[in-house]
């Protein structure tokens, strides 16, 4: 983290504060700017979390979608920190600077949920606009939606992921389904990892397994 902090401070021109790993989430929208040397030659770059089971990503992020949009979120209501795609260009890599509060966010130790919506998830899920809600900082959701409104970028928001602990989830040959009906781009383990205790961690991850509200099963035997 010290190396990342030093790099970010040098590139941004002010001292950043990254005292604990979760603080890195605030910096996700700036990764294209901070790590530009790593993404040279690529048309797009992405951010993700480590508590993710991926499905068939390219089944959702198609060439047609990439051709039309500069930013892709896997929720309909806010920019998703757990997974998002950015076009590798100056406008997108520097878009985070459009926030009136990015210096405040990056220089203070507090985690602001800048990559998403400043913790306003519940209000947005209820259908409110981010611009109707009083927030502590101008989050990346604010920034992206403003840029879309001003015709600076094209962004795609769609509910493509699974979250929570609904059960009836099945991973099968690189795809992930709910109730054998709805396919998702990924399953975010944010809530599941809080309620289960692994028993046996397999050396090789099977090609098929099921996920209940509290366990992961393979051939009806708990594997994690």
Task: Explain the meaning of each model-derived region.
Residues 67-83:
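A short, conserved acidic/glycine-rich loop-to-beta-strand motif
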Residues 28-71:
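GT-A fold catalytic core of metal-dependent nucleotide-sugar glycosyltransferases
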Residues 82-90:
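Short glycine- and hydrophobic/aromatic-rich loop-to-beta-strand nucleating segment
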Residues 3, 7, 11, 64, ...:
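Residues that form generic nucleotide/phosphate-binding pockets
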Residues 92-224:
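Catalytic core and acceptor-binding pocket of nucleotide-sugar-dependent glycosyltransferases
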Residues 3, 90-92:
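Short loop/turn segments at secondary-structure transitions that flank enzyme active sites
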């Amino acid at each position: 983290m010290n190396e990342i902090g030093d790099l970010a401070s040098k590139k941004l021109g002010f001292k950043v504060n990254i005292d604990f790993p979760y603080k890195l989430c605030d910096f996700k929208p700036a990764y294209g700017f901070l790590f530009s040397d790593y993404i040279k030659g690529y048309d797009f770059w992405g951010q993700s979390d480590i508590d993710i089971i991926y499905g068939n990503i390219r089944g959702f992020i198609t060439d047609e979608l990439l051709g039309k949009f500069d930013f892709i979120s896997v929720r309909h209501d806010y920019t998703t920190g757990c997974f998002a795609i950015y076009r590798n260009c100056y406008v997108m890599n520097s878009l985070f600077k459009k926030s009136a509060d990015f210096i405040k966010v990056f220089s203070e130790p507090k985690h602001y949920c800048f990559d998403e919506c400043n913790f306003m998830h519940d209000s947005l899920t209820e259908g409110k606009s981010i611009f109707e809600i009083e927030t502590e900082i101008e989050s990346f959701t604010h920034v992206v939606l403003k840029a879309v409104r001003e015709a600076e970028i094209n962004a795609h928001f769609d509910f493509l992921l699974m979250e929570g602990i609904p059960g009836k989830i099945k991973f099968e040959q690189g795809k992930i389904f709910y109730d054998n009906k709805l396919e998702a781009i990924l399953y975010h383990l944010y809530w599941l990892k809080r309620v289960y205790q692994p028993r046996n961690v397999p050396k090789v991850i099977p090609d098929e397994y099921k996920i209940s509200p509290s366990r992961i099963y393979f051939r009806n035997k708990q594997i994690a």
